[in-house]
Regions:
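Short basic helix-loop element that most often maps to the first helix and adjoining turn
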Residues: 32-47, 76
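Short alpha-helical DNA-recognition segment
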Residues: 42-60
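N-terminal flexible/basic segments that precede or flank functional cores
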Residues: 1-28, 76-78, 83-91
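Short, basic-rich loop-to-helix N-cap that marks the start of a DNA-contacting helix
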Residues: 66-78
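Secretory-pathway ectodomains
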Residues: 34, 52-53, 80-81
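Alpha-helix N-cap/N′ positions at the starts of helices
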Residues: 29-30, 54
Length: 91
């Protein structure tokens, strides 16, 4: 499958390019990007959920692709991670 680069607030993530007819593709793409952002932060799921103030179960459901995550939420989280990494407060 072809790959494409997805840029979230300066974090570049390589994702598989999905068929447009696949109705679950967007949810899976966002879930994968969320996991990559968390890993970039250097935090565990538990630590990341506490740091964000998001219930662990909600974050877990987003990361596993079981619950749809709004793209604007993903962008806000990416923005926070990028800025905290830049300031040296995480990572």
């Amino acid at each position: 499958m072809k790959k494409e680069i997805y840029n979230l607030e300066g974090i570049e993530i390589e994702v598989e390019k999905y068929d447009k007819s696949d109705k679950d593709a967007e949810r899976r793409r966002l879930a994968y990007c969320f996991r990559m952002i968390r890993e970039k932060s250097g935090m565990s799921r538990t630590g990341f959920s506490v740091w964000l103030g998001v219930p662990y179960r909600t974050m877990q459901e987003w990361e596993l692709g079981r619950r749809a995550m709004p793209e604007y939420v993903l962008r806000l989280i990416a923005y926070k991670v990028v800025n905290e990494l830049r300031e040296g407060r995480i990572g």
